[in-house]
A protein has these predicted regions:
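Active-site SXXK
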Residues: 98, 112-140, 147, 254
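N-terminal Lys/Arg-rich, disordered targeting/topogenic segments
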Residues: 1-15
Length: 372
């Protein structure tokens, strides 16, 4: 009898323990759900504030970070990006009235421009050649040897002549390094007042001699841009093509550069008229005389690509290890232009996703240059 009573007590105690355990689990689950609910509400509130900022905050000729540094990753993840561990991620949107509409990134961080450095070089080249007939042919020389073997190239042949406009097209559309070097040579010679086709690199140059020419030309371009368009000391181009990861710039200087391109309509027209081309046939002087079909490296211009976006007009992709960059202009249906810079991402997909998202926000006026 006593044994049965003890068994019942044990069973009763076991039931009580199970009930308490169950209640505890329920309370914990409820707590987690409530925590997630509150957290989601906070996140939703932050996103609404973010949307509000995108609509109303226009920063005239100045740079300001809307989101705090510790919020950057969280908000980017909301868009669906994954490879965002690079501390140098930065993106911005600005309109054709030279207003910075939206910016996110760290103040004072240096950016590796990669192939976007070609735009810096082209601004220098087109500035020097502004009164020169770009339908004229110029001769490729020893400078094409300066282009890295693993870099993009148009296949220029030493001694052959090419239209300047074709060189510009290949530099922008397929990121041709050899064309960039030939353009740099003729601009440098014209600026110095010497015969335009004069070689800047002697025959049979050593590796050190080639490096010195690249260094000297790059230093000249950097100094020119600092003086002409007031780039800061943050910008230091060490190779006209951007193939070296030692080239540096900043998002402030990127903005200044784009502002200069926007304010100089001829410059903008010259660069964009090439950058907006998805594919084009250039003259028979390229390669074996049969001409060459160029396909733009910007996926947003390729109608066969899933990234294709009507209204995108170049400008430039840039890729080095750990640096996937895209420097684009989007033309909205109302005729307004928007410059979009996305730099420092670890993979090309993230750059494309973010650019696509920013374009979507421009279209539906989540980013609105008339917000004020």
């Amino acid at each position: 009898m006593k044994k049965n009573i003890n068994v019942r007590k044990i069973n009763k105690r076991s039931i009580v323990i199970k009930i308490i355990f169950f209640i505890t689990i329920v309370v914990i689950i409820y707590g987690i759900l409530e925590f997630n609910k509150i957290n989601n509400e906070k996140n939703s509130s932050r996103l609404l504030e973010w949307e509000k900022s995108l609509k109303t905050n226009i920063f005239h000729a100045r740079v300001k970070t809307i989101l705090k540094e510790d919020e950057i990753k969280e908000n980017i993840q909301k868009i669906g990006l994954t490879g965002i561990n690079n501390k140098n991620i930065f993106f911005s949107v600005y309109d054709n009235n030279e207003n910075i509409i939206y910016k996110i990134g760290k103040d004072g961080e240096n950016i590796v421009p990669a192939s976007i450095a070609k735009i810096y070089t082209l601004v220098y080249v087109l500035d020097i050649l502004k009164d020169y007939d770009k339908e004229k042919k110029v001769k490729a020389g020893n400078e094409i040897e300066l282009n890295s073997k693993d870099a993009s190239a148009a296949g220029l042949i030493k001694g052959k002549e090419y239209k300047i406009n074709d060189l510009i097209s290949s530099a922008v559309i397929i990121s041709a390094g050899d064309s960039v070097y030939t353009l740099t040579k003729i601009a440098y010679n014209l600026e110095k007042g010497i015969e335009i086709n004069t070689d800047i690199l002697k025959n049979n140059s050593t590796k050190d001699e080639k490096s010195k020419v690249v260094s000297d030309i790059s230093e000249h371009i950097t100094k020119y841009l600092r003086k002409k368009i007031k780039l800061s000391d943050d910008t230091n181009i060490t190779d006209p093509t951007g193939i070296l990861n030692t080239s540096k710039t900043s998002y402030k200087d990127m903005y200044i550069l784009m502002k200069y391109i926007y304010s100089n309509k001829d410059k903008m027209k010259e660069i964009i008229s090439n950058a907006e081309t998805a594919e084009m046939q250039i003259s028979g002087d390229f390669l074996s005389g049969k001409g060459q079909k160029l396909t733009n490296t910007n996926p947003f211009l390729n109608k066969k690509s899933s990234w294709y976006e009507d209204g995108v007009v170049g400008l430039k992709t840039g890729t080095l290890r750990g640096w996937n960059n895209l420097f684009s202009i989007f033309k909205k249906s109302d005729g307004n232009y928007y410059g979009i810079i996305t730099v420092g991402f670890e993979n090309r997909k993230d750059v494309n996703m973010l650019t696509k998202e920013l374009i979507r926000r421009i279209k539906n006026e989540s980013i609105n240059s008339k917000g004020n």
